[in-house]
Amino acid sequence: MLINKNLKIGIVVEYNPFHNGHIYQLNWIKNNYPNSKIIIVMSHKYSQRGEIICMPFWKRKLWAKKYDVSKVLKLSTRKTIQAAHIFAQNAIQKLNKEKIDILVFGSESTNDSLMLKIATFIKENKEIYNQTLKKNLKGGNSFPKANFLTLKELTNEDFSLPNDILGFEYIKQIVENNYKIQPIAIKRSVGFHSEEPSDEFASASLIRKMLKDGRDVSKYTPVDLKQIPTKLLIENTFLKFKKYILKTPASKLKKYLLVDEGIENLFKKNILLFDNYHDFIDACVSRRYTRSKIMRTYLCILLKIKK
């Protein structure tokens, strides 16, 4: 652990919404590094998974400042709605420019030393890593699945939990670019997409689900949240999206960010069969395309973000 001088400590966040788990993380930093300056890089309007964030940026920034965050950096939509390794690259680059000393992230396993060891192994054995990854991609696997299988094959380690995936990608960026940043994983209060609360903690996805169901979330967040405004529910964009897909040739859809590997044809085929967002997304998910990939690509077309 670094000597507690006036350190700069970075966190990659979405705060979708801001809740007690985030307060726990910020308090942990303040307790362990009382003289530190906390710098966060926060997604703007949309999450890495391709959903609309349920609190406006300014409000999330306000709550972060209330809990002693010194500086809030904005991660643009283009840089946010990317696969984990590209999202991590964009976020860590931004924090490195701020000359942070430590990166803190929540993790299911908290084994940052093992993650560092494996990231170093990958850097030193790029050829065999890339060959194995290519083999697993050719087997019809999505990139995250192929990456997971490759790591399992080469190191016999399992990084399949959502926050371990992101945490590992952060560490890979630090190692690959020789950033002078010490990564520290702290135990998450609840799982990333956990459907069960724990004492005063609930995952952001569970809080959003509770808000949609009209349930009280005051036990899990200091923010006065009663419901998610309809304009911030991604499912309410489906009619607009459907009209656009129906009238737009596949060749034009290919010009949008993340539209590759024939995904434009898949969208054209399935759009005729479904009348709501969730059924459409479900139908597009396959061994080749993860749910997150489909959701992010949907958003790129909806927002007309070009390559």
From Swiss-Prot:
Record keywords: ATP-binding, Cytoplasm, Ligase, Nucleotide-binding, RNA-binding, tRNA processing, tRNA-binding
Keyword presence, Protein transport: no
Pfam families from the UniProt entry: HIGH_NTase1 (PF05636)
Gene3D superfamilies attached to this UniProt entry: HUPs (3.40.50.620)
PANTHER family: TRNA(MET) CYTIDINE ACETATE LIGASE (PTHR37825:SF1)
Family note: Belongs to the TmcAL family.
Annotated protein name in UniProt: tRNA(Met) cytidine acetate ligase
Organism of origin: Mycoplasmopsis synoviae (strain 53) (Mycoplasma synoviae)
Higher taxonomy: Bacteria, Bacillati, Mycoplasmatota, Mycoplasmoidales, Metamycoplasmataceae
